[in-house]
Amino acid sequence: MNKVITDLDKALSALKDGDTILVGGFGLCGIPEYAIDYIYKKGIKDLIVVSNNCGVDDFGLGILLEKKQIKKIIASYVGENKIFESQMLNGEIEVVLTPQGTLAENLHAGGAGIPAYYTPTGVGTLIAQGKESREFNGKEYILERAITGDYGLIKAYKSDTLGNLVFRKTARNFNPLCAMAAKICVAEVEEIVPAGELDPDEIHLPGIYVQHIYKGEKFEKRIEKITTRSTK
């Protein structure tokens, strides 16, 4: 089955207000630039977003904050966005800060069909408030629940026409997990090859988790902070 599309509208036309989207990336590395721009232009709002971060003021998920399209964000780091900070302090957006490893495992559990699991991370902190706790072998654990979403929006380096994906280095990050935990996964890629051309050993995410593949013409790939030094 050829999963390649040339128009994101074919994959995202059913995305509606109030849906939950799982967005890959770490900072600005490996983010689905085209899908985010599509949502921004369509004005889809009241979204529940699950992502490592919320982009920067004018790029990534940050552009969805400009028109207040995000109702709730579940993330592990949100410190690079002034618009986000303002909306959070003014009570305009619901924020669920989650330890990074816990966020990854919540998505993994969702993709694996595991409804909940116990972890020691967050015990004795604000993270544990309102959560069930139990003791195992003399150590306290809190119950974390799996995360699933309506759409997984991810970015990969290469795909074959069946949706088998290859990521590049750190750009892999949360992308495979967002694909696994979503009902529908839309993968943006830089290169598409015929089915059978990828060595099975180099495939990072099997095509069973991917419903649509979109080849971007050019990815901006911004850097959050550029640090330079004098040539002297």
Curated annotation (Swiss-Prot):
Its EC number is 2.8.3.5. The keyword Transferase applies. InterPro entries: 3-oxoacid_CoA-transf_A, CoA_trans_fam_I, CoA_transf_BS, NagB/RpiA_transferase-like. It comes from the Bacteria. Keywords: Transferase. GO terms for molecular function: succinyl-CoA:3-oxo-acid CoA-transferase activity. CoA binds at residues 24-30. It is an enzyme of class 2 (transferase). It catalyses: a 3-oxo acid + succinyl-CoA = a 3-oxoacyl-CoA + succinate. Heterodimer of a subunit A and a subunit B. Belongs to the 3-oxoacid CoA-transferase subunit A family. This is Succinyl-CoA:3-ketoacid coenzyme A transferase subunit A. It comes from Helicobacter pylori (strain ATCC 700392 / 26695) (Campylobacter pylori).
